[in-house]
Design a protein with these regions (language model features):
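Alpha-helix boundary/N-cap detector
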Residues: 25, 46, 115, 152-159
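Flexible helix-coil transition and linker loops at the boundaries of alpha-helical arrays
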Residues: 73-77
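Short, low-complexity, Pro/Ser/Thr/Gly-rich segments in the mature regions of secreted, periplasmic
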Residues: 154-173
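Short, aromatic- and cysteine-enriched interfacial helices/patches
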Residues: 17, 25, 57, 130, ...
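Surface-exposed, polar helix/loop patches in the mature regions of secreted/periplasmic/lumenal proteins
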Residues: 78-149, 154
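Bacterial Sec-dependent N-terminal signal peptides
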Residues: 1-27
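Immediate post-signal-peptide N-terminus of mature secreted/exported proteins
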Residues: 24-72
Length: 173
């Protein structure tokens, strides 16, 4: 009986470990899949540009939250690092959902309302800054670029921006 309890406890612990591990891989998975899409010449140019935005947004976010200097610091607190990784992955997940919601709303919108949908989504990324980065040339590089299908600000709190967009009554648009 005690042996069974130990095995059961071990199985539960292993399953929790694997869930935690996979939850911490959101950002890396977005970077990995985006890189594959960017380099896949069989994909449409728009699809590749969306992947490039995701890659750039996640690279920017990671550089601000978890620069290499922090990762290489032997004195870095494990709890602090884990909190930063958790934050990065929450932001990465929210960004991915945000882009999916944007694409869905654009597909559902009537032709005459597409400009409004784009404006709302763009403005939301601008209004919900995460870092208040002064390098506006960089963080706004996609924002007014007509060549990009995703024209969002890189300096964005994706969790708050997603919550804002979800609060809009889309039935009237």
């Amino acid at each position: 009986m005690i042996y069974m309890k130990k095995i059961l406890t071990l199985l539960v612990a292993l399953s929790l470990f694997s869930v935690k591990s996979s939850a911490q891989d959101v950002l890396n998975e977005i970077l990995r899949t985006s890189d594959i899409i960017i380099n896949d010449t069989t994909k449409s140019l728009n699809t590749r540009k969306v992947a490039l935005f995701k890659f750039d947004a996640m690279t920017y976010l990671r550089s601000k939250i978890l620069p290499p200097v922090v990762m290489l610091d032997k004195k870095a607190n494990a709890d602090t690092l884990n909190a930063k990784i958790r934050f990065l992955n929450e932001q990465a997940y929210a960004m991915s959902v945000y882009i999916s919601v944007y694409q869905k709303r654009m597909n559902e919108a009537k032709e005459k309302n597409r400009y409004l949908v784009t404006s709302l989504f763009k403005q939301a990324t601008y209004d919900h800054k995460l870092f208040n980065d002064t390098d506006t040339e960089y963080v706004m590089s996609y924002y007014d670029n007509k060549e990009c299908p995703i024209q969002f600000c890189l300096d964005c709190d994706w969790v708050k921006t997603l919550a804002f967009i979800r609060s809009i009554d889309w039935s009237k648009i």
